[in-house]
Amino acid sequence: MNRYSRNRISSEDTLWEKRGGRNFRKDLKTGKDGEEIVRKRLLAFPSVIDVRDISNSKRGIDDDIDFEIVYKDGHTSTVEIKTDLMAHSTGNFAYEEYSHRNPGCFARTKADHILYFLYETGEVYVLNPVKFRTYISEMKQDKQRARYLRIRATGMGEGAFGYLVPINVLKSTDVFECMFNAYPKAKAA
């Protein structure tokens, strides 16, 4: 049984899906498509020799990790990939803190990095998950600063809650590590 069928209670649409919200199966496909695009791009880096999909392994499921990257010098790092279809137009990262009373992926991942992939533009932001959690915690404590920076709590669909964080704000913090484009130059927006 794979990770997704294990977590999905029913093959029926949720109430939110029936009301015109996103569709779980479509979101899952979009996420997997995004992961494959990013995986191919990672393999193109000269220092990378392999990108292993561990998302359905015990470690991948328990630690919420999508890929293990193997480098030429022998070291490895792990990544959780988030594919976002709206960030290019909203200008926000979506930090899902809770989903159906469970910690959201950014709140629970043990990956070394979050690769936040903007599907429409190909931009991939490399974020530090520990520092991202700390940053969100600080914003929850300093509501005035959060308001000034336009970071806001929001519902994110049925059973989900989190924060919208402006991309430009996060890029100026130590959460942001670097950025690259997943698409060949000819396809970049």
What are these regions (language model features)?
Residues 2-56, 85:
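Acidic-basic catalytic patches of nuclease active cores, encompassing PD-(D/E)XK
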Residues 2-10, 14, 22, 26, ...:
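Non-catalytic C-terminal interaction segments of nucleic acid-processing enzymes
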Residues 21-25, 50, 82-124, 129:
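Catalytic cores of nucleic-acid endonucleases
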Residues 33, 62, 109:
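Short, well-structured alpha-helical interface segments that form or flank functional binding sites
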Residues 42, 67-69, 73-87:
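Conserved catalytic cores of phosphodiester-cleaving nucleases, focusing on short active-site segments
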Residues 48-49, 115, 149-153:
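Assembly/interface hotspot detector across virion components, adhesins/toxins, and nucleic-acid enzymes
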Residues 52-73:
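Active-site metal-binding core of divalent-cation-utilizing nuclease and nuclease-like domains
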